[in-house]
Amino acid sequence: RAILLGNLAQQHPDYSLLEQLSGELATMTGASAGTVGEAANSVGGYIAKACPQQGGRDAARLFAEPRKAYVLFGCEPSLDVANPAQALRALNAAEMVVQFATFKDADALAYADVLLPLAPYTETSGTFVNGEGRAQSFVGVVRPTGQSRPGWKLLRVLGNLLNVEGFDYMSSEEVRNEILGAEGTLPEGVLARMLPVTAAVPTPVQGSGLQRIADVPIYFADALVRRAPSLQKTRDAQVPVA
């Protein structure tokens, strides 16, 4: 017996409550509880703390409550967020926008003050951590094109220019080992300790009105597959018909 929470549950405003209830239900019924990861490296992102910490703002709030400056990393707001119009308004009104971009997008040219050439995931080495906590390292299939560079190298150079400590990595393996340890693997039980189900975080939700629930087609999930003509001709890329 197993209770699994999927992507729609993770996008729910009360996901923390759903996770807590599923854990309690699993305990009462003797079932296993788990979550189907939203992306290939969702767990890795949590381990690296690439998510709002205590008192931090998530992406939705950063656009709903406009900031003076934004740094976008491998993100195309017009296609990657739930409310692209709101995101573009915030970006166009900002005093400074720096974007690490793989493609020179027309929207980005309008709002970005600086575009840094980011190599796609196919042109860099790195490590993903999957839903069961397994670290999976890989290498780039080709060298980065032109002046584009892997993301970790761009961040390292910026850190060096700003004289920030801790930006002396010489390889993606060194970055991985900084996060996962010298062995480059997760200690047993680290996921359970990292994401304890202890309390729900209340999120105000409007009691009436419309809520958008949308599926992201498999070949529309990132900047690379969106621009692959062969993939866009497949049946899986077609717009759903009600």
Q: What residues fall within each predicted segment?
A:
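A glycine-rich, hydrophobic/aromatic-adjacent loop/helix-cap motif
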Residues: 2-64, 212-216, 224, 229
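Short helix-capping/linker segments at secondary-structure and domain boundaries
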Residues: 13-14, 32-33, 161-169
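An alpha-helix initiation/capping motif
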Residues: 15-19, 152, 173
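Short loop/turn and capping residues at structural boundaries
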Residues: 36-37, 120, 170
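A cross-kingdom feature strongest in bacterial/archaeal respiratory oxidoreductases
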Residues: 48-147, 153-165, 173-242
